[in-house]
């Protein structure tokens, strides 16, 4: 709605009878439009202040969100302007400025020294001016230098390993590389602690991983009769990564999701390397599936245990429990800019232990992402590797299909998108890897395998498209998915024992 008002001004002395003395315009202030009748032949500077005063009185009860931040008390000189255009000259009249009845104007506050001139001469220059891409400055140079350190370290490590191999595999090489890795780790700590450079500290930490893992791998002696690097060296490198991750705890920026991912993956690699080293390589795929299932199905429990989120004490009737007993208080908690004012007010109104609960909740979310992602990766790798030719070919294909279905079902149970993405990626990666593996084994049936693969992919896309308008899973459907998921997991374990020959071993036991 608009509030019409008339701002009277002195009449021009030489106005002719053919030209109207007033002009009806619409003034836009925020989202409110107000119709005004203004003098047409008088310079605008003679009545602009009166017009602003009238509008201020008319719109004084208008909500602030309707005005859109418009402030009648702004400093400067008021002027009229067409929307998106420079202000009109105050020494001109509305007729001189080409303002006619029905024109839309806005009020702007300008300085008396403001001058408006075109910034560009053509469209190409305008595009160049509007391009707000960041320039290459000192910060960009620092980022480049930080990222270049681990990238250049990788080929240097490769050359050092080649020299170590060609010069008799002396222990001085891994010792020197390990000392260099420790020095870089100290540099990462110094960069984060004293120079507050998180990017450089993270780049140095990545470099430390490369150096320490290489040193640990080269320090493991080759077995007798072996002339190449193998499972013992992989186990040594994975062990170094595991202990380094436990020591750094997510690095300078507390990336706990990456730390938890590295820990679980390193444990799986160590176990697989040990199995290969002692001749139990046939058990590695089944063991990977079992370990991956354990991590994926128990990720929430592991998260609560590692994050140390304790349940509040349950008092007996009549017993009072202090709020501070829920969690240990955190000294001098500092609010971050990411928190809303409402959340900050809530935190300020409760004991300091609530801040610790918030920190633990964030840590739990990061740990859950890492656990589910690593468990899914191990599960997918085991599902592809477990398929073997021979008597258990069909059995192993059934196990891989069940694992694919389990990953697809569980992707709908997680609200965290990274967890869902990891499970969906496994749902796609397992059939793709199996198809590639079968084509390598049976190249004459490649056309049939590819046709089946593309048909299944097309059906999956149709199913996903048909569920585009399903915003959430109902409790009944969710419970059904959980039951199907549990039944499939229960079917996977016996089939794994069957494939690995455990049943045959038990059957052949003689007392």
From Swiss-Prot:
Stretches of the chain forming a coiled coil according to its record: none
The keyword Transport appears for this protein: yes
Annotated family: Belongs to the EccD/Snm4 family.
Entry's Gene Ontology BP terms: biological process involved in interaction with host; symbiont-mediated evasion of host immune response
Cytoplasmic compartment spans: 2-143, 192-202, 249-257, 307-367, 410-420, 466-482
Organism: Mycobacterium tuberculosis (strain ATCC 25618 / H37Rv)
Protein name per its UniProtKB record: ESX-1 secretion system protein EccD1
Membrane topology note: Multi-pass membrane protein
Predominant location category: membrane
Gene name linked to the record: eccD1
InterPro entries referenced in this protein's UniProt entry, alphabetically: T7SS_EccD, YukD-like
A Pfam cross-reference name: YukD
Other remarks on this protein: The structure in 4KV3 was determined for a fusion protein with E.coli maltose-binding protein.
Function: Part of the ESX-1 specialized secretion system, which delivers several virulence factors to host cells during infection, including the key virulence factors EsxA (ESAT-6) and EsxB (CFP-10).
N-acetylserine carried by residues: 2
Organism phylogeny: Bacteria, Bacillati, Actinomycetota, Actinomycetes, Mycobacteriales
GO CC terms, sorted: peptidoglycan-based cell wall; plasma membrane
Subunit description: Possibly a homodimer. Part of the ESX-1 / type VII secretion system (T7SS), which is composed of cytosolic and membrane components. The ESX-1 membrane complex is composed of EccB1, EccCa1, EccCb1, EccD1 and EccE1.
């Amino acid at each position: 709605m608009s509030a019409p008002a008339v701002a009277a001004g002195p009449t021009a002395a030489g106005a002719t009878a053919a030209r109207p003395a007033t002009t009806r315009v619409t003034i836009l202030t925020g989202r409110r439009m107000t119709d005004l009748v203004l003098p047409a032949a008088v310079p605008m500077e003679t009545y602009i202040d009166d017009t602003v005063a009238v509008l201020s009185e008319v719109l004084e009860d208008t909500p602030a969100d309707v005005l859109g931040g418009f402030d009648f008390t702004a400093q400067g000189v008021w002027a009229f302007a067409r929307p998106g255009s420079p202000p009109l000259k105050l020494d001109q009249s509305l007729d001189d400025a080409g303002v006619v009845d029905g024109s839309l104007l806005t009020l702007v506050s300008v300085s008396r020294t403001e001058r408006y001139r075109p910034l560009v001469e053509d469209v190409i220059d305008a595009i160049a001016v509007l391009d707000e891409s960041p320039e290459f400055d000192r910060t960009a140079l620092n980022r480049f230098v930080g990222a270049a350190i681990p990238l250049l370290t990788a080929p240097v490590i490769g050359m050092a390993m080649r020299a170590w191999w060609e010069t008799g595999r002396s222990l001085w090489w891994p010792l020197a590389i390990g000392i260099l890795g420790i020095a870089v780790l100290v540099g990462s700590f110094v960069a984060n602690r004293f120079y507050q450079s998180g990017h450089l500290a993270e780049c140095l930490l990545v470099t430390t991983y490369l150096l320490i893992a290489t040193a640990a791998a080269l320090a493991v002696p080759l077995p007798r009769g072996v002339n190449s690097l193998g499972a013992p060296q992989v186990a040594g490198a994975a062990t170094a990564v595991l202990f380094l991750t436990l020591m750094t705890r997510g690095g300078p920026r507390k990336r706990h999701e990456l730390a938890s991912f590295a820990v679980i993956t390193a444990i799986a690699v160590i176990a697989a390397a040990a199995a290969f080293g002692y001749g139990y390589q046939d058990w590695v795929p089944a063991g990977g599936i079992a370990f991956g299932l354990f991590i994926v199905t128990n990720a929430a429990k592991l998260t609560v245990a590692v994050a140390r989120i304790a349940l509040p004490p349950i008092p007996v009737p009549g017993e009072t429990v202090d709020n501070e007993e829920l969690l240990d208080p955190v000294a001098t908690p500092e609010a971050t800019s990411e928190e809303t004012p409402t959340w900050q007010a809530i935190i300020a109104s409760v004991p300091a232990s609530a801040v610790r609960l918030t920190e633990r909740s964030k840590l739990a979310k990061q740990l859950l992402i890492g656990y589910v992602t690593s468990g899914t990766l191990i599960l997918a790798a085991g599902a592809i590797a477990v398929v073997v030719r021979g008597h258990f070919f069909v059995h192993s294909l059934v196990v891989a299909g069940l694992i694919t279905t389990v990953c697809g079902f569980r992707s709908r149970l997680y609200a965290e998108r990274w967890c869902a993405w990891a499970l969906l990626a496994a749902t796609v990666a397992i059939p793709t890897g199996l198809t590639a593996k079968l084509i390598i084994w049976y190249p004459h049936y490649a056309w049939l395998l590819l046709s089946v693969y593309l048909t299944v992919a097309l059906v999956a896309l149709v199913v996903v498209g048909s569920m585009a308008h399903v915003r959430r899973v109902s409790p009944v459907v969710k419970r059904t998915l959980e039951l199907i998921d549990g039944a499939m997991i229960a079917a996977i374990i016996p089939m794994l024992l069957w494939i690995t020959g455990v049943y045959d071993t038990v059957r052949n036991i003689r007392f």
